[in-house]
């Protein structure tokens, strides 16, 4: 498969992942803060699960994907019991 065909196959695919925030998901539990809200490492893991969901159906046996950059903004805290979701869209393919 050419680089162009590879890019066309994955560009624009979308995946989603969701979770309910539990005690073990908090900044306190992860040692990344002192408030009982969703920890940043958990936010990144949620985003990675959305990325996997986006690419999984398009990948062939033996293929995988790795993240090379993470950029996000905290726009609101998520307390225990909150339902949160991540949506991933493939906007660039690098080989």
Regions found by a protein language model. Give the residues of each.
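Hydrophobic beta-strand-centered segment that forms part of the acyl-chain substrate-binding groove
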Residues: 51-85
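Catalytic strand-loop segment that frames the active site of acyl-thioester-processing enzymes
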Residues: 2-38
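Residue-level recognition of well-ordered beta-strand positions that form the cores
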Residues: 18-20, 71-73, 87-89
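A short mixed-secondary-structure module that forms the rim of ligand-binding clefts
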Residues: 39-43
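Short coil/turn motifs at secondary-structure junctions
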Residues: 24, 52, 91-95
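HotDog/MaoC-like acyl-thioester-processing domains
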Residues: 12, 79-80, 87-95
């Amino acid at each position: 498969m050419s680089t162009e065909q590879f890019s066309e196959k994955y560009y624009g695919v979308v995946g989603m992942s969701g979770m309910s925030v539990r005690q073990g998901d908090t900044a306190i539990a992860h040692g990344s803060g002192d408030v009982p809200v969703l920890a940043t490492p958990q936010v990144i893991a949620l985003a990675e699960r959305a990325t996997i969901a986006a690419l999984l159906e398009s990948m062939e046996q033996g293929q995988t994907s790795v993240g090379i950059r993470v950029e996000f903004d905290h726009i609101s805290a998520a307390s225990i019991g909150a339902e949160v979701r991540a949506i991933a869209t493939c906007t660039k393919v690098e080989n």
